[in-house]
C-alpha cells in the first residue's frame, strides 16, 4: 500500500513563543511601572554590618529580601549580631520589627550599637518589704515605662494582647484570649504587618527579627495543657510560616515589588546523639527544618559542641570583669548569587559597644579603659583608685 504524503504544519497557525507571552499577558509593559509578571530581580542589597563582620564573613551584611538565620549556643554573640542588624536597618530607612519571645531584648544594649529609641518615663508604684518587721511600704518611683522610636516591638504579652483571641485549629477569632503566646502568633504578627504594607498603611520596608524560634510552643501544645511534643511545634511552624518564608519575603526581591522585606530569626542549637549513635553527635536546631530549608543565609556563632568562645577579662586582686568575648562566626549555608555565594569563617569580638575586629582589640582596650576601670572599681568596692597598671588582662578559652 502506498504511503500518503503528509505536509507538516498544514492547518496549524504558526505563532512564536513571544506572541504567546504577549497574548496571555506574560510580558510586562515597558512603561517604567512593571507588574507582577516581571521575573527580574532587584540588584542584591544589604543591611550593612560593621567591619568585624565583613572581615570575618567576606559579606557586606545581611542580604535584603531573604530569610536568614543566626544559630548557636548561649552567650556566643547572637544578640550582638541582631542588635547591629536592627540599628543598621533603622539607619537605612527600614522598620525593625523586634519579636522578642525570649523576653530578653535590651534597649540599652541596642542603643550602644546605634539603635535609636527614646525612653518614656512614668510614675510606678513599688512595694518594698522590711526584712526585720515584714512591713510592706508602697512608694512611687519615676521609671521607664515605654521605649519609643522608629521600630515595632512585640513580646509575649503584646502578642497575646493582639493575637491571643485566635483559635488556630478553627481558623477564627474567639471571645476568650490566651495568656500564652504561640508560634502561630508570630506568623500572624508578620502577616498582619505585611498586609498593612500592601494596603498602604505603612510605606516602608521591614526587617523582621524573631528571637528565638525555640522559645515558645505551638497552639496544639497550648491546648494540651503543657504536654509538649517537638514534632507538633515543627509542624505548626511549617504550616504557619510556609507563605512567609517561601513567598511573601522572597517575592520582595522582584523589581515589581515596591518594598524590601527581610526576615532574620535566631535559633539555639542542641546536640543530637540519637541520629548517629555510633558516631559524633550532630548539631540540630529547634523548630524542625521547614524554616531552615527556606533560609538563604545561615550564620553559626560560636562552636558546635560547645560555645567555643574566649572570655576577655580584666582582673584586679582576684576580681574579674568580662569586657567581651572572642567568638567564632561561620557561614554554614549560603544560597546567594555569585559573587556573594561564599562560606567563610572567622572571629569577632562581641563587646559592650558591639562587634570589634580582633586586630583592633588593643585599640578597643585603650579607648575603653576608663569604663573597664570603672566597672572593676564597682565590683571590688575598694577605696583605692584602680589604674591600668593594677589590672591584668586575660583570655579564658572554652575549647570547641
What are these model-predicted stretches?
Residues 1-75, 80-99, 167, 400:
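Detector for small/aliphatic-rich hydrophobic stretches
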Residues 60-63, 88-92, 193-203, 248-259, ...:
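Conserved catalytic network of the ASCE P-loop NTPase/AAA+ motor domain
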Residues 70, 99, 207-211, 264-265, ...:
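Extended hydrophobic secondary-structure segments that form protein cores and membrane-embedded regions
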Residues 71-73, 99-102, 266-268, 301:
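Short His-Asn-centered micro-motif
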Amino acid at each position: 500500500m502506498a504511503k500518503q504524503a503528509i505536509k507538516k504544519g498544514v492547518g496549524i497557525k504558526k505563532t512564536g513563543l513571544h506572541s504567546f507571552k504577549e497574548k496571555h499577558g506574560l510580558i510586562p509593559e515597558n512603561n517604567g511601572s512593571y507588574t507582577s509578571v516581571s521575573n527580574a530581580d532587584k540588584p542584591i542589597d544589604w543591611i550593612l554590618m560593621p567591619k568585624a563582620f565583613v572581615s570575618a564573613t567576606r559579606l557586606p551584611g545581611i542580604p535584603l529580601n531573604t530569610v536568614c538565620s543566626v544559630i548557636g549556643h548561649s552567650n556566643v554573640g547572637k544578640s550582638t549580631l541582631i542588635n547591629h542588624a536592627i540599628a543598621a536597618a533603622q539607619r537605612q530607612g527600614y522598620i525593625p520589627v523586634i519579636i522578642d519571645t525570649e523576653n530578653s531584648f535590651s534597649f540599652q544594649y541596642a542603643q550602644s550599637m546605634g539603635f535609636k529609641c527614646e525612653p518614656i518615663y512614668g510614675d510606678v508604684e513599688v512595694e518594698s518589704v522590711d526584712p526585720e518587721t515584714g512591713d510592706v511600704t508602697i512608694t512611687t518611683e519615676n521609671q521607664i515605662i515605654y521605649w519609643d522610636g522608629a521600630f515595632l516591638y512585640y513580646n509575649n504579652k503584646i502578642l497575646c494582647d493582639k493575637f491571643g483571641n485566635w483559635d488556630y485549629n478553627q481558623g477564627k477569632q474567639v471571645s476568650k484570649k490566651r495568656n500564652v503566646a504561640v508560634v502561630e502568633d508570630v506568623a500572624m504578627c508578620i502577616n498582619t504587618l505585611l498586609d498593612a504594607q500592601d494596603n498602604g498603611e505603612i510605606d516602608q520596608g521591614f526587617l523582621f527579627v524573631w528571637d528565638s524560634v525555640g522559645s515558645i510552643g505551638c497552639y496544639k501544645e497550648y491546648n494540651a495543657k503543657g504536654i509538649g511534643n517537638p514534632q507538633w511545634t515543627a509542624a505548626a511552624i511549617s504550616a504557619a510560616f510556609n507563605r512567609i518564608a517561601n513567598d511573601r519575603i522572597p517575592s520582595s526581591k522582584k523589581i515589581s515589588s515596591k518594598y524590601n522585606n527581610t526576615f532574620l530569626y535566631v535559633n539555639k542549637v542542641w546536640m543530637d546523639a540519637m541520629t548517629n549513635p555510633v558516631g559524633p553527635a550532630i548539631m540540630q536546631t529547634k523548630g524542625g527544618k521547614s524554616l531552615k530549608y527556606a533560609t538563604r543565609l545561615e550564620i553559626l556563632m560560636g562552636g558546635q559542641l560547645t560555645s567555643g568562645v574566649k572570655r576577655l577579662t580584666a582582673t584586679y586582686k582576684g576580681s574579674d570583669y568580662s569586657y567581651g568575648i572572642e567568638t567564632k562566626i561561620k557561614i554554614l549555608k549560603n544560597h546567594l548569587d555569585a559573587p556573594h555565594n561564599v562560606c567563610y569563617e572567622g572571629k569577632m569580638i562581641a563587646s559592650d559597644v558591639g562587634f570589634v575586629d580582633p586586630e583592633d582589640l588593643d585599640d578597643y582596650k585603650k579607648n575603653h579603659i576608663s569604663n573597664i576601670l570603672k566597672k572593676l572599681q564597682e565590683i571590688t568596692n575598694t577605696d583605692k583608685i584602680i589604674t591600668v597598671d593594677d589590672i591584668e588582662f586575660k583570655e579564658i578559652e572554652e575549647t570547641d
